[in-house]
Amino acid sequence: MAEKNSSKYLTHEEAAHAIVEVGKRMYLKGFVASNDGNISIKTGEKEILTTPTGVSKGYMTPEMLVKVDLEGQVISGSTKPSSELKMHLRVYSENPEVMAVTHAHPPVATSFAIAGIELDRAILPEAVVNLGTVPIAPYATPGSQAVPDSIAPYCREYNGVLLANHGAVTWGKDVFEAYHRLESLEYYATVLMYTGNIIGKANELSSKQISQLVEIRRKLGINTGGTPKGKDLEYKIEDNSPDKFLIRDIIEQVTNTVLKKYKSK
């Protein structure tokens, strides 16, 4: 009978199997295309198992994975790690509680990242509890040092971040929690798209309701995610013109700009 692994870290085999499984799920969900995306798991105090560069996440095998140290230097494996590994390493460095990181380009969430719209509206109890708000990191060239620098401020307080004009990154206590947050992020973005841009109406949760959900989150041992602002009045948009972003933040920006111009006359 095999001995159960009592370490807080997965064995190499366990981690490799989990990464391959999550890679397939990301691919089948349409969160990645071609060779996009990357996944990593912390397998020791100074070791990370991660996905290789130039490989479709839907067709990975355990043998393709590569082990690196916290500086990104290869320890073992016949492949090269992704150039975006720096982003993963920064999350681990900023938040010691994190044990896994996922990065992908889920289409709806990425569209919000391109539009510059944070996922911060309290419309779904599950999103408040399991995911929290999702900020946007400033644009940085993929693979450059600017990417990890751009996400560093968000790694401790939040569970994920949108990358401007790029995609999304999520993290967690294991790779499945990190992946499920990626799923939640895309679902949350999709509902926001329907209510904000298509239906044009969303009844947001009140401050009191949000506080109750945050307390539930705390009891579940989740102390990260940020807190969305409550909006006690119904949010309704009458104009569904396709050439406008019907999202609160954009409308407020435009309104403020118009008022400034009016006052200056």
What does each model-identified segment do?
Residues 1-265:
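Glycine-rich flexible loops
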